[in-house]
Amino acid sequence: VTIIHRGLVADHSWGFCDFVGTSYNPRDFEIEIQSNLRPDDYIKTLLHELVHLRQWVRGTLTMKSGKMHFKDKSVSEFEYMKQPHEIEAYAEEIKLYQLYMEEVHGMPVKKPTPSFTNRLCEAL
């Protein structure tokens, strides 16, 4: 996994996770994260993109005929925030952020607000 920090404002995003090379059984990945995020937004974005990495590795997120599929269903017909792989990533991001804050910082977080980091501007 390579993590790249760069400006993603033009992409209306705080982060992306992409495979490098072939989409068949991908094992090399790049995670791009918006430069200069607040620390909590950076952590949430990284966790969100790591959920996507897990989806690729487990094979629940795939590319078929140039279209992204989640659990064998094309996601292209869904609006961004209704895409099932994004719904899962946002839900997991919240859980993982809670665990991180409790275990690393000793700060319980009851209901962290999701950052809605990827392509949110386009979805709204």
Predicted regions and their residues:
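Active-site hotspot residues in diverse enzymes, especially metal/ion-binding acidic/histidine motifs
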Residues: 1-8, 16
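Short, solvent-exposed loop/turn segments at secondary-structure junctions
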Residues: 8-9, 37-38, 98
